[in-house]
From Swiss-Prot:
The keyword NADP does not apply. Signal peptide: none annotated. Belongs to the RuvB family. Residues 184-254 are annotated as: Small ATPAse domain (RuvB-S). This is Holliday junction branch migration complex subunit RuvB. Residues 1-183 are annotated as: Large ATPase domain (RuvB-L). One of its GO terms (molecular function) is four-way junction helicase activity. Its EC number is 3.6.4.-.
Amino acid sequence: MKRDDLVSPECMDGDNVYETTLRPHSIKEYVGQKKIKKTLPIFVEAAQKRKEALDHVLLYGPPGLGKTTLALIIAREMGFNIKVTSGPVIERPGDLAAILTNLKDYDILFIDEIHRLPHSVEEILYPAMEDFYIDIVIGQGPSARSMKLDIPKFTLVGATTRAGLLTSPLRDRFGISFRLDYYAVEELTKIINRSASIMSIEIEHSGALEIAKRSRGTPRIANRLLKRVRDYAQVKGEGIIKRAVAVHALEMLEIDDRGFDQMDRSILLSIIENYGGGPVGIDTLCATVGEEKTTIEDVYEPYLIKEGYLQKTARGRIATKKAYEHFGKRKFEVGQKELF
C-alpha cells in the first residue's frame, strides 16, 4: 500500500482481509449512524412479523463509511442468506437473471456501486423489484419471443457513492433509503478501541483519540491507520499505542492533525499559490496536481468541502479562509488590501 493510499476511503488491496474480521455482526455492535440504528431495527422487525421480504434498501454516501457492513447486518438481522456483487461485474442482462433465479425467498441481494449498472441490466431490475418477475428473451431475430419468469421474493440492497447518478426509475423503487454521514471523532475512537481489542493491540485512550482525529471521519481509514501505528509502536513504542507514539507515527506517514496527506495539501496549495485562491477549473487543477478527475472528486473533495477548506462553485474550486489559515498564509488581491 502506498503512503498516499492510507487516507483514501476507497477499499485497497489488503483491506478486505482485516475488514472481514473487524466488521460488527449486529446493529447493536454497529457504532455511529444513529438515525439508521434507530429506524432499521423497526423495519426489520415489522417485515419479520408480516413474514415478508424487507423493502428494498438504498445506502448512499462517501466510501468507507460502512455500506457493505450494513448490508451484511441486514441479512443477519433478517436471518437469510446474502449474495454480494457489484455493478461493474454484472455486464449483461443474463448475468443478473442468473443471480436472481438462484436466490431463495427473502434472500438479500447486495449490489455495490449500483450506479454503474449498464442500462440494459437496470431495466431487468424494474419488474424484479416491483413484482418479482423478469422478462427473458428466447431465440433471436423475428422468431424471438419474450417469456415471463417468476423469481423469489427478495430484498435488494443497493450501495452507491454517487446517488445523483442513479436514474429516477431505479431510485424510486427503493422503499428504504439511508444516507451514511461522516463519523464524529468520539465514534471513531470507539471503533478504534474495538478494533484494537479484536487485533490484540494495547492502546491508550489518548492514542485512539489521536488516530481518530486524523481519520477523516471514516472507519476504513481509522482501521488502516491503526494497523500502521501498531507497526510503529511495536518497533519504537514498546508495543503500546500512546498519544506520543500515534503522533510520531502519523507525522512520519505525513498525515497531519487534520488528516490531510500529501495530495490534500497539494490540491489546496496549488489553488492558493498557483491560482490566487481560485476559482480554478477541475481539469486545470487535475493537470496541476497530476491526479485523475474522478479521484479528486470522489476521494479528496468531499472531505475538504465538508471540513470547510474548499468551495465547489460553477466557476471552479476556491480555497477558503480556513485553508489559508491552516497553511499559515494570508490572501491578497492585486490592487486591494489584505482580505483576511
